[in-house]
Amino acid sequence: MKNFINIRDISAKNLRKIIFDAKLRKNKRKKLNALDVDKDNPLRGKLLVQMFEKSSTRTRLSFYLAIRQLGGGALNLRADELHFAKGESLPDTAKILSTYGNAFMLRTDSDHKLEEFKKHMTIPIINGLSPSSHPTQVLSDVFTIEEIKKKPISKLQICWIGDPNNNVINSLIEASVKFSFKLIIGCPKKYYPNKNLLIWVKKNKGKIKIFNDCKKAARLSDVIFTDKVVSMNDKTNKFKKLKDFKNFQVTSKIMNCAKKNAIFLHCLPRGSEVTNDVFFGSQSRVFQQALNRIYVQKSILLYCFEKLR
């Protein structure tokens, strides 16, 4: 049994195995419908219990399809539907979920809660998003980049424009170390990545640079990422933050600073951090990016069940 909580906790070798398996499985589904089961049916009869404390579109749908295509089934729960929301202890809830299900995916508003579920569960647990991390999204993004660019991400320059301290960029920073790629962050002054994460990056010889000018950050990059400036976990002054980031919108001028064949990625949902012409433009790959979550999450599930080929 293995868990999938943070990218930094998983070896580069196992992360690469997940991506390799996802590529094989995607190639074998070209003539199959969304609910058709993979021929090897590796998780036949397995139940994935999903609990959502926060709203979800792509994570909910992609994990549902992932477990179905592997031969299993999914049960979606909201915390407020359970006795857990009305006083039943977390350890008791974890034991019950472990009794009924074979794996547990949690989308939560608390990193502490995620760790407590991990401590008390006897089945694999997957982080479907927490305040500090979104590992399933970012591993899927690495897959998408390599699929489009047809080369290892270690040979590419990745640029992030926007908030340098949210769950997606945290996982992207961790991935930059595990996959050895150059990561450039463009953000306003007085905004910085998580300090403890930067210490970990330095200790592991990561390749990260920070610019307070988004044109300089985007220069000669192969991929431009962004995300909502005000995320689901933000407790800061919304209007002040939007004002601080007004010059860090991804526009066609920013894309023109990157390489001619650069692509644009966004985990969604979007706000004002990207213009429509970029989002719907020829360099945007956001819908391919969203689709690929199914395939990578299938391989994450197999990793957790120790059934990776």
Predicted regions and their residues:
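C-terminal helix-to-coil terminal segments
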Residues: 280-309
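Rossmann-like adenosine-cofactor binding region
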Residues: 202-278, 283-284
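Glycine-rich phosphate/diphosphate-binding loop of Rossmann-like nucleotide-binding domains
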Residues: 53-65, 147-226
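Active-site cofactor/substrate anionic-group-binding motifs, chiefly glycine-
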Residues: 47-100
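Anion-binding alpha/beta catalytic cores of soluble intermediary-metabolism enzymes, centered on
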Residues: 30-32, 95, 102-175, 266
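Short, structured coil segments at secondary-structure junctions
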Residues: 70, 100, 120-122, 179, ...
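Positively charged, low-complexity intrinsically disordered leader regions
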Residues: 1-61, 65
